UniProtKB/Swiss-Prot annotation:
Chain ranges of the VWFD domain: 1564-1732
GO biological process, any: cellular response to estrogen stimulus
Post-translational modification: What corresponds to phosvitin in other species is lost during maturation of vitellogenin to lipovitellin.
Keyword hit for Secreted: no
Glycan attachment residues as annotated in the record: N1097, N1298, N1675
Inducing factors: By steroids (estrogen).
Domain Vitellogenin: 18-658
Segments of skewed composition (Low complexity): 958-976, 1128-1149, 1178-1192, 1217-1238, 1253-1286, 1323-1344
Name of this chain's protein: Vitellogenin
UniProt source species: Ichthyomyzon unicuspis
Modified residues (Pyrrolidone carboxylic acid): Q17
Bias type Basic residues, positions: 1194-1206
Region (Disordered): 953-986, 1119-1289, 1308-1351
Amino acid sequence: MWKLLLVALAFALADAQFQPGKVYRYSYDAFSISGLPEPGVNRAGLSGEMKIEIHGHTHNQATLKITQVNLKYFLGPWPSDSFYPLTAGYDHFIQQLEVPVRFDYSAGRIGDIYAPPQVTDTAVNIVRGILNLFQLSLKKNQQTFELQETGVEGICQTTYVVQEGYRTNEMAVVKTKDLNNCDHKVYKTMGTAYAERCPTCQKMNKNLRSTAVYNYAIFDEPSGYIIKSAHSEEIQQLSVFDIKEGNVVIESRQKLILEGIQSAPAASQAASLQNRGGLMYKFPSSAITKMSSLFVTKGKNLESEIHTVLKHLVENNQLSVHEDAPAKFLRLTAFLRNVDAGVLQSIWHKLHQQKDYRRWILDAVPAMATSEALLFLKRTLASEQLTSAEATQIVYSTLSNQQATRESLSYARELLHTSFIRNRPILRKTAVLGYGSLVFRYCANTVSCPDELLQPLHDLLSQSSDRADEEEIVLALKALGNAGQPNSIKKIQRFLPGQGKSLDEYSTRVQAEAIMALRNIAKRDPRKVQEIVLPIFLNVAIKSELRIRSCIVFFESKPSVALVSMVAVRLRREPNLQVASFVYSQMRSLSRSSNPEFRDVAAACSVAIKMLGSKLDRLGCRYSKAVHVDTFNARTMAGVSADYFRINSPSGPLPRAVAAKIRGQGMGYASDIVEFGLRAEGLQELLYRGSQEQDAYGTALDRQTLLRSGQARSHVSSIHDTLRKLSDWKSVPEERPLASGYVKVHGQEVVFAELDKKMMQRISQLWHSARSHHAAAQEQIRAVVSKLEQGMDVLLTKGYVVSEVRYMQPVCIGIPMDLNLLVSGVTTNRANLHASFSQSLPADMKLADLLATNIELRVAATTSMSQHAVAIMGLTTDLAKAGMQTHYKTSAGLGVNGKIEMNARESNFKASLKPFQQKTVVVLSTMESIVFVRDPSGSRILPVLPPKMTLDKGLISQQQQQPHHQQQPHQHGQDQARAAYQRPWASHEFSPAEQKQIHDIMTARPVMRRKQHCSKSAALSSKVCFSARLRNAAFIRNALLYKITGDYVSKVYVQPTSSKAQIQKVELELQAGPQAAEKVIRMVELVAKASKKSKKNSTITEEGVGETIISQLKKILSSDKDKDAKKPPGSSSSSSSSSSSSSSSSSSDKSGKKTPRQGSTVNLAAKRASKKQRGKDSSSSSSSSSSSSDSSKSPHKHGGAKRQHAGHGAPHLGPQSHSSSSSSSSSSSSSSASKSFSTVKPPMTRKPRPARSSSSSSSSDSSSSSSSSSSSSSSSSSSSSSSSESKSLEWLAVKDVNQSAFYNFKYVPQRKPQTSRRHTPASSSSSSSSSSSSSSSSSSSDSDMTVSAESFEKHSKPKVVIVLRAVRADGKQQGLQTTLYYGLTSNGLPKAKIVAVELSDLSVWKLCAKFRLSAHMKAKAAIGWGKNCQQYRAMLEASTGNLQSHPAARVDIKWGRLPSSLQRAKNALLENKAPVIASKLEMEIMPKKNQKHQVSVILAAMTPRRMNIIVKLPKVTYFQQGILLPFTFPSPRFWDRPEGSQSDSLPAQIASAFSGIVQDPVASACELNEQSLTTFNGAFFNYDMPESCYHVLAQECSSRPPFIVLIKLDSERRISLELQLDDKKVKIVSRNDIRVDGEKVPLRRLSQKNQYGFLVLDAGVHLLLKYKDLRVSFNSSSVQVWVPSSLKGQTCGLCGRNDDELVTEMRMPNLEVAKDFTSFAHSWIAPDETCGGACALSRQTVHKESTSVISGSRENCYSTEPIMRCPATCSASRSVPVSVAMHCLPAESEAISLAMSEGRPFSLSGKSEDLVTEMEAHVSCVA
């Protein structure tokens, strides 16, 4: 090293130094200016002129003295304008600059700098900028060389080029610096700790590029080199978007010229000098938080300023947000940052009693981001001056925004131990998580985080672990995850799966949190995290959820291609499909990423996907999935990505855990924006089991009551005895929380909550407490009512800083460049409430008294918000600031002034609202780009774009440039100021081409663009308008940055359409109950009066129409008793109404009138068609049955089926025109009357078109399927003795699908079940008659769905009426009336209709919507709107049925004429979007024309877990087979209800269907016989069962299992069964030997409802035991067990865990996985005194001698798990080989051998496995 240094010194030139006793005098000019790079636009900057004297003291030291300081600023068009002096407030700063400063100088390099302590850092930094010009590293005989050189900006890459001058003693040196290539760069950041650098993004586009060029002229003197002149130019270029889209620059220049060298005596030395460091720039300690580019705080009385700003905020934000409120709030924040804790505490003590001031102070303290804010918070909490709500808000906000320093971390630690926080759990969680985030921000820019900062979190983790407090462990792990430091890895590893004593030492929840805590650590040390999580993923013995979570962390750490390929190779033989599906889906989605951040991972995953192939791509949504989608825009260099993780549970469709994350990329950085997560493992069990457990008959059993009895205790103890007999039993840890969720912001967890038993108990306690304190609740209600009567005034304001991002780095002149983004906002909500009551309320008022009165509430409310975003690029110092600034302001506000009336007794609600009476701006957005200069004398600003500029006039006129809302700028017109300083680089330096470009730009005028669009509302006599005005810099360059630079104003406003207010108020009235009809009749009477008034001028007479309306409305208002009294016996109300309407129709027809006007409720064309049809059908009305039969056959005779497909128009959605005769039975007449009334000719059609019904459209399919339906029903009736249990087993079976039949798409709708009868000729005719009548009723059902029918209104009272009315000054009716009718069909199923009409009597617009639910889960909905509900029509029909004998559901959407907008949307969806969606879903296509104007979707359940889908569009059919469902399709028994059965209500049926899906009712089955075993997961094993020993076949794995199924094989090879069911012990040997609690009970007694709570049914060969959800089928040779899917993963025993995990199928009671099946089966033997009698088998540790492979010595090896062996007095008659793990000890170790010989118990469980060998396990023993 020393040799290299000597060689370097040998090549160095003579030292550049200052000779002692000489003074070197220089003139120095420097400036820095910011703005757009093009000439002609306005820029802003700072400049300085001064004289410099350098006195040489020794060869290595000199003194610099500054004189004649002249500070200036620039504000105007560049380069034509000049600099102007800064005068006011700079005297003290200039005095500091003129203080002499000493510095070390050796071999051309600047060393340490010494200055008096009173000299500020800003002055010393300017001295550094001057000395930076003297930093030279020249080498002898080298003209070009590179090195890392120290400068003001840091230690950066520097290139030297040395050229000889014209004279012998002169040389020219050019030095360039790449400021983006630095070993140590000087910069400061704020608000970017959570942002991660994106190296690949920076390679594509460097957002901040910096470079500097220095030109030197040097004299070569014998005494050394002297700098004659030096010029520097530095460019800082910021590209917000892609570099081609424009950039903003900061240009800095320095000029140093030698004026002379004189001899002078040595200068006097300062009394005390302090070492201020080297040449690199030094930021003040609080510069990042206290140096704001927006405000100048130096020299101000800050306490007075704070009071002034607070007063402005309080007084001007009472009703709505003031437009300057966000800026004022930022000013308040800036002032508070510059005061100490004492001043802040003084302000609080003065104002905290005033609630308005209190709110603003508490909002501003978190935005301070200084340690004084934490100190203030600590003192305020200690004095308990905050409420819990205020404390939670301010603690979270303060810790989230806090600038991380050692001082703030110390205060935060003290904050955690305050009693106020410790005693509030929610607040404590917030504080602990916030402390972890604060540590993360502090250590973000350090190599290693100090241990003392993490010690509080490590202590919390250790202490909670010692106490086994799971909640505290989770909190500590989450806080360490927020901190994200590699120092915590060892602490976290203890809780990772596979790292402790066993895999299940901690609960799954704790292990999952430990894995996820590594996510932030992976950002700092990805390789270490990969080494930890990869073994977890590869370990198949670990639970699938934990392996999946490790995979999430693994891919977030951005692994290499090699590691991803390793995962892919392991995935080829992955036995766990949940893990395989998740990892494959994650790699597949990542491989499609186009975001540069994921470029390397995407390439690695693309290779891995090719290795795996498409085998795993066929796994459906039943399995866990990961989805990653992203987008990236190259122009803006910004993107967004989203991740969705779903970890499925084998126990049902509800996932075990879900998480979603949104991540953003921009400016070369990436950050997690927000993340939500939910874990709900216990939620499905809660939904399935409910609050009470059901016995075999559905009766609720109270388990606690049973356990209180002595008999129950004895049997519970019996269960525990059985558990103790199992070797090393460990109950599976219960997942205590039912659900838990969390929210992360910027990768930091800010809040998490859990719903567990404790939380449920708290909620229950609060509920019971509220009920028990009923009097207190009534008192609170009375207090609120009293306040409302007096009038309540509520004001809520909130000020906030959304984002504050700053980046500061020095420029060459020694002042910092500041990039700043600030987003702040203020919201105000104010409401004035005043209530009045129709009657005075009693003093002891109750809620019932309040509801019995008519309440009138007057409301005057306003809500408003204003948001202010500021982006700055400029220069900032304590005194002066200059730069370019863009403001974006948005304000929105809305006021409400109205009245609410409510009468609960009469079910009436009415609200009125006053409309806008004048122009009201709702949303206002402005954007302004300016250049500014701020100093203590004021603020000067100019727009970036001058209105017009020429070269002849050097300056923009004051009238054009001066802003109207700022202080008076410096007078540019003063000639002496203009001539004070002229640029040394004048315009003659530009080439002619450059001057022409300058002239073109400066003489151009930016264009003002305007745009306005309004949408008028005639109903409200107002219009909503959007207007915009834009003036940008796109005329200079067509780039994105220039398009958003300039001035922009847009607003959304509401304005009345006329000067006179036509609408006085808008009313909304809702009436329900019996009074609803009154609202309808009032509206109709108005229409009737208007129609009578217009009769005189109308050519169309309407005789009898008004009388008909009034008679119908009177009938509506008549009571139900009157209608029942008038109703003849045996007739229905519908028939009487039908006949009434029919007679009315005929009388109207006889009058010979023309079609009535469109506002009436009767259509005469329908009546004529009905009359004509009745006359045509009267000849064939001999009997109702024949008439009905003929009616059903008529469509086929007249070619109706052909017209179904040949029609070229819209399908007719109404009934058939061939209705049955009016002389039929009452139901028939009702049907025909309904049809005749509803058959309305649409207004847009000229010629009537034959109608079709849904029954006729599928008549061929129906007839072809009727025979198969009847045959299937007959076969089912012949085997009616089979139980419902067998039906469910048939449903579980997987049937083969006939592929050719599937492509026919023959869907058979569900039919009514036929009554079982003998098939005789008579019955056959009867059957046909029934079929025809069924068809007729089907047609009638279709006719009910015609939207134009009015029969519903005639037969039913309206249930709800909603009237939206505009009260006009001219008294005209304007608004909308909506009427809701609902009732029940003849089958007791719901039907409903909604009718909406306009209130204007001149309007014919109407909307009709009908809904009906028919039997067998068939629903129809139709809607029509427009002219008399007939202009536009659509219908939806949903039904259940069969597709090739598989249960299916079908949804049909039909439409007629549609509005043009809907028509375009429909065409775009069907023709453009549908093929794309089908292609993404990989659906097959069949070019097949289907019905026009109809879309059909058929879903068929081929198996309980697989579904086929068919989508029929008018021109094509899409289908897909074998779609794997995440849930189990409900059993067909759900809709196979007999017609006459007592079915549940509709809500109960829907709840049952949903419950069937959520509960996933497909049971898991396990079967065992004497030779083999098939587990719940379907694994098959051959097993030679030991005799006379009980095996645990199946049980629920918990500390108190509700059931245990035990089996035993006797000496005759017969199986006996024993069950322990909660409080019962059942033993079954045969059908004649059944014992309950030792008492023999006959089978017939157990086959019916009994006191034991279970059933035993005789199923022929088998006995079937039913207990709750458990089913056990038994005979002497085999046993079958069915458990519900709610026990997925919660069973154990020989039948396995029931978790679909075949690799871990052989889990023993100690949760270890057995080496072979025999060892697994033997581990579940419960040996007792009956296990072999005197020669009973028992578990014994076996011994084997072995020789050590390494040392060759003898060892004694013992089995780690005992195996089945006979006693020493007996010998084995049968044995089987088993694999045994051995633990070996030296031969001289005799402790275990002695224990074995003495028969003392010992265990080697958990010891290391040194040897695995095969040994004999005994099966039976003989004496």
